[in-house]
Each structure stands twice: as structure tokens, then as C-alpha cells.
């Protein structure tokens, strides 16, 4: 189990660790992923624990103490954020940018150079991409992977916007 939707970095980490044919599924929150393991519905949970640019994902450390799960493995995933918009959208159209708080932080130099853009935190990068597609509003953009952009039919308005070009997230694999 991983948090987010298909095309999220958690999804990518799960497939990287377990293989492309692995039976993986998504849940809404990091805590939900841990509960899936605790209650026996999933053998494993895949959660981000640390990023080379933004540091520790402290909420997940807190959840590790709260839940009866154990770290049984880890994998590192290269993270390369792009600014994604609807086909036909331009940078000049953008007014709101959606993404996970960690991704917004990792892209802060680029995003802050566009002061007119309102940054809106969401639970996941790929969820943000899906929202932009579903809302069909050219003033919206998402910070997510180019893979998520392709999956949800979005256009890359600006590739590689994270300030650390060697951006890596360490994911932990949890079991009961």
C-alpha cells in the first residue's frame, strides 16, 4: 500500500522496490498505509521518510511510533518535479499551483520567482495533477512528475523545477 494515486512518487517507489508487476494499491493517507499493514490487508506499506532537499518527513517518524509496524527495507527514488498544466495552458495563465508541501518546498526557488502564483498544499503530487485535469481550469498547475503528467494528460509547462537537481527521496518499506 502506498499513499496517493497512480503516478505518485510513492507508487514509483513501490514498483521500483517490488518490481513492475507487483500488486500495489493506493490509500488516502500515510497513516492509512500503516493501518492497512497493521490490520493485515497489505503485506507492506511504502512511505517516504527523508528527502535530500527538504529533509525528514517528520510526520512519518511520528506515525512509526504510533503504529505496530517495522521497517524491513528501503529504496531511494530520484525525484524530478515538473510544472504541469492543461494542454493549451501557458505559464502566463497560471494563478494557482497545487502539490504536496514537500514538493512545494523542493521547488521554492522557482515558485517564489512567480509571486502571482498562489501555492496550495495537497496530500500528494499525483493527486494534484489529477485535480488539475478534473477541474479543467487553465489557471491551475501542479508540481508533480512528468510520469504523472503523461498519465493524466497534462502538458509540461516547465521541466525540472526543483532547485536540487540531485533530488532523492528515501522510502521505507514497512511490515507487521
Predicted regions and their residues:
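Domain-level signature for soluble enzymes in the chorismate/prephenate branch of the shikimate pathway
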Residues: 1-176
Amino acid at each position: 500500500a502506498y499513499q496517493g494515486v497512480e503516478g505518485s512518487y510513492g507508487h514509483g517507489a513501490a514498483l521500483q522496490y517490488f518490481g513492475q508487476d507487483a500488486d500495489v494499491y493506493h490509500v488516502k493517507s500515510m497513516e492509512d498505509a500503516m493501518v492497512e499493514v497493521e490490520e493485515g490487508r497489505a503485506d507492506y506499506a511504502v512511505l517516504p521518510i527523508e528527502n535530500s532537499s527538504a529533509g525528514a518527513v517528520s510526520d512519518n517518524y511520528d506515525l512509526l511510533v504510533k503504529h505496530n509496524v517495522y521497517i524491513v527495507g528501503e529504496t531511494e527514488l530520484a525525484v524530478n518535479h515538473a510544472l504541469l498544466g492543461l494542454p493549451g495552458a501557458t505559464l502566463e495563465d497560471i494563478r494557482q499551483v497545487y502539490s504536496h508541501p514537500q514538493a512545494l518546498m523542493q521547488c521554492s526557488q522557482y515558485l517564489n520567482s512567480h509571486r502571482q502564483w498562489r501555492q496550495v498544499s495537497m496530500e500528494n503530487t499525483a493527486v494534484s495533477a489529477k485535480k488539475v485535469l478534473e477541474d479543467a481550469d487553465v489557471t491551475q498547475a501542479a508540481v508533480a512528475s512528468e510520469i504523472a503528467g503523461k498519465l493524466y494528460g497534462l502538458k509540461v509547462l516547465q521541466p525540472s523545477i526543483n532547485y536540487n537537481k540531485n533530488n532523492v527521496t528515501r522510502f521505507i518499506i514497512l511490515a507487521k
